[in-house]
A protein has these predicted regions:
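Acidic, proline/glycine-enriched N-terminal capping motif
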Residues: 1-136
Length: 136
């Protein structure tokens, strides 16, 4: 079992709170995955820390609160993980190339994903924490 808050092994490079809760492949008009990835990237500018020099792999802890329409928990992480993937940033023709933390979103680079979902009676929100594994 891994403890992401273990600062001897992990470095937190992003702790981002946004006032929305999105999922991958929402089929409603005007809600494209590319637009959502760009929203996350734009929100991360000025908040994200530089990646450590030697990263073994990456981990995500995502906490979502949602009012109203239910979300599929398995679709929450896809858009977020893709937001910081260099390959996806290039495919999106995004100007946020400096936010590419890993070349691809495979197990070779992203090994831990924790998603915590909560119902809210007041607001939608998402907290994204990204950790670099720096020591075994």
């Amino acid at each position: 079992m891994f403890t992401l808050d273990d600062s001897d092994k992990f470095v937190k490079v992003l702790a981002l709170d946004v006032p929305w809760a999105h999922t991958y492949a929402d089929m409603r008009p005007g809600k494209t995955d590319c637009e959502r990835r760009e929203n996350y990237r734009n929100a991360a500018v000025g908040v994200i820390q530089a990646a450590p020099a030697s990263v073994l792999w990456w981990a995500f802890r995502i906490t979502v609160s949602k009012v109203g329409r239910p979300l599929d928990v398995d679709n929450i992480a896809k858009t977020i993980i893709d937001s910081f993937c260099a390959r996806q940033i290039a495919r999106d023709r995004s100007s946020f190339t400096h936010l590419g933390l890993y070349p691809d979103d495979t197990f070779d680079h992203v090994r831990i994903l924790q998603v915590i979902g909560n119902r809210s009676t007041t607001v939608d929100s998402t907290r994204i924490e990204v950790f670099a594994r720096v020591r075994e």
